[in-house]
Amino acid sequence: FAELREDMEGAYYGFYFVEIASYYCREANDEREMLKLLYQTMRALINEKIPNRLIRYIYELKAICINGEAPQVFQCVVCGDKERPGKFSTLKGGKVCTHCIRDVYDGLELDPSTWYTLQYIESAKVEHLYNFTVSDQVLRELAMVMGRYMDVYVDHQFKSLEILKLMT
């Protein structure tokens, strides 16, 4: 990925993605899916049509999925309802429908496009992850969801992310 030598921000995103892969991967485990994700993500970084922030949120969510810690975005985590609208609760681990929301204090109201994006990222094959863009609103909502989710469920402070935050 020689193109990243001339793109400091892209290079630091790459460092961040490698750091996440290092955090999740374990010796003697079958880590092909995570390595495939890392490879496709690095390829996406050199594609100027996809914003780096979107690449970041896609990578974070898919890495969490591969590790088996994905939020439930297809149905209510409390009652299992798939039809009712809901809010995203980090503390509950995903979608909470309008019927079950009364005990939830961290619910985020998400645009239907954001719900669809989360569902697509979780269900798509790694090879098809980086073939779309989103509106600014969806990008902001993805930032909120992934920021909160990473803070609660990923027990690690990534040094490269700290540098990225200073750069952007």
Predicted regions and their residues:
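Non-catalytic alpha-helical scaffolds and adjoining flexible linkers that form interface surfaces
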Residues: 1-168
